[in-house]
């Protein structure tokens, strides 16, 4: 089964509020995006691994006008478009694997990723991811990234993950980005379990 087939099956068979990473609002992500854009509502923003999360909904409601979303699952994108209704036309959609996606160069001020990067357990895939972010984010722009923290789970959705502290994450991105901020946050899953996330802000050099 390919990665795309795997994630299509996840989004076909599980309710949006039943997956472990579900949160009714992505308040930390929105707050960090507001901060790094200095509330510039025309800042180009892309959400990597958008899934069925409500980040684009929240950013649209907050007045941001240049939004894109990427996910490997066409099923997730279709459901997000349905949820948004006519507003989905105000978002640019990419159905692709982030390690091989074709993205415009120097296009984005903000690259947001909540819970994709930690699934990249092989170094070549991480290197492709960093290269994609380097090429797509404008110098001075930011990556807002959330991964499992050092005490986070070892698996998610049945797949292995890599846990990070801020020093480890900074080292992975060091050739093109500098870490400017990080914080640990506990996420409560729909099943009531606690998962530790690391939120990091990295500035494009």
Where is each model-derived feature located?
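A conserved beta-strand element that flanks and buttresses the S-adenosyl-L-methionine
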Residues: 112
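Short catalytic micro-motifs in class I SAM-dependent methyltransferases
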Residues: 115-119
